[in-house]
């Protein structure tokens, strides 16, 4: 998490922007002062969690960083979990003091979407594409490692040219553990060597290098 030194920014509350990325596994809250991230908080995404529970969790965490967000300057939400939209709408209104802006499929961002059905492109992928073009120019490829691993291509004209969706590394590993009765869960990390000399090492090598190969292979083909 990034915190802006020891100087409290509570007096500047109205200038602060709260951005919320609601993913399938985690929800990340970021606070921006202008174009600078001053603090962020990561919570697990839980369908049963209410706006009041989120508020009770978040406000003390932000307060510890010197941030009073009961009257934030704005709230922007990108979510891939539609059933939670009402929860974050209420959270923004009652705990951050403003009406939220939801980034949704079909939103006008100034970026041409070269997709058969532009409305199918998820909010997370739209945000990634626009941010990548803004930060790095184009052409550019964005790789997002989440529950799914997505590859999104912005072409030389600055247009969203399409993408690739692959299973995420965690759910890929879980599928292996679930369907292979004699294999057990291991930490997902780079193994000491490519060729495993025990079951744990062999599984780690397969997961790690298999996934590296997937990413490298797709990027090579995109180039």
What are these regions (language model features)?
Residues 17-21, 76, 140-144:
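Short glycine-aspartate micro-motif
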Residues 1-13:
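Short, basic, low-complexity termini and linkers enriched in Ser/Thr/Gly/Pro
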Residues 14-19, 45, 49, 175-223:
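ATP-binding/phosphotransfer module of carbohydrate and carboxylate kinases, centering on a glycine-rich
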Residues 98-102, 107, 111-179, 209-223:
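Phosphate-binding/catalytic loop of phosphoryl-transfer enzymes
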Residues 58-74, 219-223:
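Phosphate/pyrophosphate-binding loops at sites that engage ATP/ADP/AMP, CoA/4′-phosphopantetheine
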Residues 26, 49, 78-85, 205:
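Glycine-rich phosphate-binding loops at beta-strand->alpha-helix junctions
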Residues 69-80, 99-101:
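Short glycine-rich phosphate-binding loop at a beta-alpha junction
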Residues 12-63, 158-184:
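Short glycine-rich, Thr/Ser-proximal phosphate-binding strand/loop in the N-terminal lobe
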């Amino acid at each position: 998490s990034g915190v802006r030194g020891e100087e409290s920014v509570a007096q500047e509350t109205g200038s602060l922007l709260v951005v919320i990325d609601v993913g399938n596994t985690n929800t990340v809250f970021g606070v921006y002062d202008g174009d600078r991230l001053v603090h962020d908080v990561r919570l697990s995404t839980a369908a049963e969690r209410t706006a009041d529970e989120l508020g009770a969790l978040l406000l003390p965490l932000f307060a510890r960083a010197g941030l009073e967000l009961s009257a934030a300057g704005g709230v922007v939400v990108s979510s891939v979990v539609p059933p939670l939209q009402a929860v974050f709408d209420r959270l923004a209104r009652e705990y951050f003091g403003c009406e939220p802006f939801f980034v949704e499929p079909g939103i006008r961002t100034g970026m041409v979407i070269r997709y058969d059905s532009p409305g199918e492109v998820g909010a997370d992928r739209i945000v990634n594409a626009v941010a990548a073009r803004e930060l790095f120019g184009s052409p550019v490829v964005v790789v997002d490692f989440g529950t799914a691993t997505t590859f999104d291509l912005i072409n030389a004209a600055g247009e969203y040219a399409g993408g690739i969706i692959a299973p995420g590394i965690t759910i890929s590993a879980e599928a292996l553990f679930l369907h292979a009765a004699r294999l057990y869960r291991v930490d997902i990390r780079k193994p000491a060597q490519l060729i495993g000399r025990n079951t744990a090492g062999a599984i780690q090598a397969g997961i790690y290098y298999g996934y590296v190969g997937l990413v490298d292979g797709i990027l090579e083909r995109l180039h």
